[in-house]
């Protein structure tokens, strides 16, 4: 019966991924079939954690987060959880022998979102990004290299750069919602009451540097994941280019996005670039 519950748990993680993120789902479908489920399992866990701190405003979020964290610890210890999302995540956690530090750092950053509203220095900012994004990239990297420690260490810095780039693009895209609805400001030393073109351009230059380093690592990924990760890169880099063209005052007043029809165009472009070795 545990086998059936595991199948149901994995279906839940897949459903969460496809319901919350069309872009991530599209990129995951470009991975080898053998590893897609493990990426769904990771994303489902990440998404559920984020949902608690970002969306459930009518409930005691700290209480819910504490319960969730306790359930997470027990699921890893006992190798089962009645929460299907945690049950599928713990399966992937043990399958690839994740370092528990990755999970702990992620949960630390999520907990900061309950109370910490402003990041006034680079140290806290970098620590938050490491916990909220870089470690997720490292979990996925574990899956891509099938637990190969040597390969993991070779690609670690690139996975972190790509995770940082993706997260910073999210921050810039969600500036309006984070600032107005969640009262959060992630970028240090930026006055969001007077968000200037110079502020925007400095942030974009930082993100472009992360993308440049992250792209180097995509070339070195195994065949099982290279195209899928490149597809995700193309989506986020295209979103960054769109943000770059958008005046700073509009970034604070609207949410910039890539329409679904354009995502399909990016997928086709990614396929062409990948198969003809014209990465950009």
Identify the role of each PLM range.
Residues 1-168, 172-280:
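Catalytic cores of Mg2+-dependent Asp-rich isoprenoid enzymes
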């Amino acid at each position: 019966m545990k086998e059936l519950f595991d199948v149901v748990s994995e279906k839940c993680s897949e459903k969460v991924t496809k319901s919350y993120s069309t872009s991530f789902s599209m990129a995951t479908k470009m991975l080898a079939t053998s590893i897609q489920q493990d990426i769904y399992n990771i994303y489902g866990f990440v998404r559920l954690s984020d949902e608690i701190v970002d969306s459930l405003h009518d409930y005691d979020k700290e209480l819910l987060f504490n319960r969730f964290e306790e359930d997470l610890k027990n699921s890893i210890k006992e190798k089962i959880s009645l929460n299907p999302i945690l049950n599928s995540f713990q399966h992937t956690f043990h399958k690839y022998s994740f370092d528990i530090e990755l999970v702990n750092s992620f949960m630390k950053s999520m907990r900061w979102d309950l109370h910490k509203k402003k990041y006034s220095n680079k140290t806290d900012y970098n620590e938050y990004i490491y916990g909220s994004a870089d470690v997720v990239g490292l979990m996925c990297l574990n899956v891509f290299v099938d637990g190969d420690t040597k390969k993991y260490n070779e690609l670690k810095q690139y996975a972190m750069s790509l995770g940082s780039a993706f997260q910073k693009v999210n921050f810039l895209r969600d500036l309006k919602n984070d600032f107005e609805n969640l009262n959060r400001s992630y970028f240090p030393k930026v006055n969001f009451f007077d968000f200037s073109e110079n502020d925007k351009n400095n942030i974009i230059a930082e993100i472009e540097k992360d993308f440049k380093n992250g792209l180097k690592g995509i070339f070195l990924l195994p065949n099982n994941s290279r195209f899928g990760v490149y597809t995700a890169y193309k989506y986020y880099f295209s979103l960054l280019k769109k943000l770059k063209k958008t005046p700073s005052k509009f970034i604070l007043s609207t949410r910039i996005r890539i329409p679904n029809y354009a995502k399909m165009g990016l997928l086709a472009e990614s396929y062409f670039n990948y198969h003809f070795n014209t990465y950009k």
